[in-house]
Every structure is written in structure tokens, then in C-alpha cells.
A protein has these predicted regions:
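Amphipathic alpha-helical and helix-coil boundary elements used as assembly
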Residues: 1-283
């Protein structure tokens, strides 16, 4: 008997794979959100002839979504080439409907860092820099190892006397600390280990500048296989008129640390004030 997995034919260009699940998963549709310093989230709908896929088979399992371009038309056997592979962990599972032939499901794929939002803690960190605090949380509280994250920083960060985490989930806590000192993060895929990797940076060295995209509305036109803009919208909202900050430094008690600024420069469509006390900015 052959040990090779069975070959399954699928009309979908994309592939969904969940560790430990041998059922055929035929991708029906997907949508994703990505941004810097925010865990990505991909919701993927799929069908399967297996009517008994359970939440235990999906949740907390390593998974990947492989995006592939359509094959060129013509004679001969064509092999699809992966355009991108998104690695992560399944954090959501849905059973959407069923018929005699197949059942429709959906899963939510996120990086492992997103699981930190499920961990609320109260803790005190002393004599540690922000990168050291983040690494301590990743290693000791969430079991991550060196291959799971990467710090590529151009500056040295001072140790802080004391940092408190109070009734705050780990993801929000480290994102807040990193944002205070100008460190941002993104996610990549280690194709050798088949894992998602979070990378931390503090410079614009990796930014691509001067990029242009054609505007190609989808009304009877096509993008000819290149990235293009389909639509543009403009939204306006009322925002706060001014920002006020106050603080006190016992080492420099006579120092005036009260400030107020009109961030809108006189815009009459604004309202209200944002007041901040003791934001722990270094002075």
C-alpha cells in the first residue's frame, strides 16, 4: 500500500492546509487585513466532503494559506506557482452550512503573536529596556524561541527603572511599549521551518519609496497581471481640537511640564480636548 497522500483536484487557485487535518479543503473565498504593528487576520471559507470537521480539529492548529496565480492558458500540463504563503495558527472556526455532497466551513488564520491578546496579566518589570521586556514576555510567558522572532534595531534603548502592566493583555502591552519608543513590527514566513516570524524594526531602511500604481476601475478593464488601484474613497470625521499634557518629575520639581497645543491649527470643524496626565515620556 502506498504511503503517498492522495491527489485531489480542486478548481481553486489557492490552498488551505491545517496541521493534522487529512480532509480535502477546497478554498471558496478569503479576505484578509494587514497593517504594520498589527497581527494580520485572514478569514477563509472552504468546502469539504468531510461533514464531521470539528473545532478540535481546527482551533489552535498550525495552518497555512497558499496564494497562487492562475496558470497560463494553452496546451500541456501547467503547474501553479505559489505567489505567497501565509503561515499562522487557526484562532476561529465556523460551520456555515451543509448539503448532501459537502459542508461549508470558515477558519480565521492569525499569527501566533495574536494569541497574546488572550493573556491578561499584572506584572512589574524593573531595570529592563523595552526590547528586553518584549523578549522576556515572548520567551518566558508564551514559549517562543529564537526562530520565532527577530529584533533588527539600529539604536540602543535605555533601561527603565520600573514598568507596570496592570489588567492589560500582553499584545496590547507590548504594542504600547514598542510604539512609545518608535519600534514597529511585521510578519514574514520561514519557508524552511514553515512558521510565521515576527520581526521588529526601528528605522525606515526597509521602506520602498517612490512606488506608483495605475488606477484601473474594474468596469470592463483589467489590470493585466500587475498591482493596480480599483477604487478610491474619501472620509471625514470630527476630531479633537486640542491636546493637553501634564506631568511631574520629582527630580526636577521646578520644571514646567504643562503643555497645550491646537493640533488642527484653527480648524473650525473640530471639537473637544484630549487630556493626558503622566504619560511617562522621558524628559
Amino acid at each position: 500500500m502506498s504511503n503517498n497522500p492522495p491527489l485531489r483536484f480542486s478548481h481553486s487557485h489557492h490552498l488551505l492546509s491545517v496541521k493534522g487535518c487529512d480532509a480535502g479543503l477546497d478554498v471558496l473565498a478569503f479576505e484578509g487585513d494587514e497593517a504594520l504593528s498589527t497581527p494580520f487576520s485572514y478569514r477563509t471559507e472552504f468546502t469539504s466532503a468531510d461533514h464531521a470537521i470539528s473545532k478540535e480539529m481546527m482551533l489552535m492548529k498550525a495552518a497555512s494559506l497558499t496564494l497562487q496565480a492562475p496558470v497560463d492558458q494553452g496546451y500541456g500540463i501547467k503547474i501553479q506557482q505559489p505567489v505567497r504563503v501565509i503561515q499562522g495558527v487557526v484562532t476561529g472556526f465556523e460551520r456555515l452550512g451543509t448539503s448532501k455532497d459537502e459542508t461549508r466551513y470558515a477558519v480565521t488564520l492569525e499569527p501566533r503573536l495574536a494569541l497574546l491578546s488572550r493573556s491578561h496579566q499584572n506584572a512589574v518589570y524593573q531595570d529592563m529596556s523595552v526590547p528586553q521586556i518584549v523578549e522576556k514576555i515572548l520567551r518566558e510567558r508564551h514559549g517562543m524561541r529564537g526562530q520565532d522572532f527577530l529584533f533588527s534595531l539600529s539604536k540602543e534603548y535605555p533601561r527603565r527603572e520600573q514598568v507596570m502592566q496592570y489588567a492589560e493583555d500582553d499584545l496590547h502591552f507590548i504594542t504600547r511599549l514598542l510604539g512609545e519608543v518608535g519600534i514597529w513590527f511585521r510578519f514574514t514566513t520561514d519557508t524552511r521551518l514553515n512558521i510565521d516570524v515576527v520581526e521588529f524594526y526601528d528605522s525606515q531602511q526597509g521602506y520602498e519609496k517612490g512606488l506608483t500604481l495605475p488606477s484601473v476601475p474594474p468596469s470592463g478593464q483589467h489590470s493585466q497581471g500587475v498591482d493596480s488601484v480599483w477604487d478610491m474613497e474619501c472620509h471625514h470625521n470630527v476630531v479633537q481640537k486640542a491636546v493637553s499634557t501634564r506631568d511631574y518629575n520629582y527630580r526636577q520639581a521646578s520644571e514646567d511640564m504643562n503643555t497645550r497645543v491646537d493640533a488642527t491649527r484653527g480648524d473650525v470643524t473640530t471639537y473637544g480636548e484630549a487630556y493626558h496626565w503622566a504619560d511617562n515620556y522621558l524628559t
